[in-house]
């Protein structure tokens, strides 16, 4: 494992997983859409395939913002071994009762996580 960060804010109801690789053009809007959620009872997990662009720097730039909102934020960056392996890594890191996947080039609307 090359790098791993975990900011744990308790047991979440929902785990949201994003798998990414060289996603600097889209990942900021993806992550921001989770910060804009109307609820905070979730955790966000990003699994990066050792991006060669600025994806990791963008992911790092959100660490304190999630901490300030009390949202668990975890990310890992390891050599890419395939998308399904990356999804499994995210699932293994998750603690939520439910799991949802969000593409690195997609966003959630503000109320997407509301129950």
Question: Which stretches of residues belong to each language-model region?
Answer:
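Nucleotide-sugar donor-binding/catalytic module of glycosyltransferases
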Residues: 1-115
């Amino acid at each position: 494992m090359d790098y791993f960060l975990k900011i744990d804010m308790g047991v979440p109801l929902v785990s949201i997983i994003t798998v990414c690789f060289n996603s600097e053009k889209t990942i900021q809007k993806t992550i921001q859409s989770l910060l804009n959620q109307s609820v905070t009872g979730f955790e966000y997990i990003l699994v990066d395939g050792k991006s060669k662009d600025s994806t990791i720097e963008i992911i790092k730039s959100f660490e304190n913002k999630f901490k300030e909102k009390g949202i668990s934020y975890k990310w890992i960056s390891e050599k890419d071994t395939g998308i399904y392996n990356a999804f499994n890594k995210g699932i293994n890191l998750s603690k939520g009762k439910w799991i949802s996947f969000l593409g690195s080039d997609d966003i959630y609307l503000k109320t997407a996580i509301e129950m």
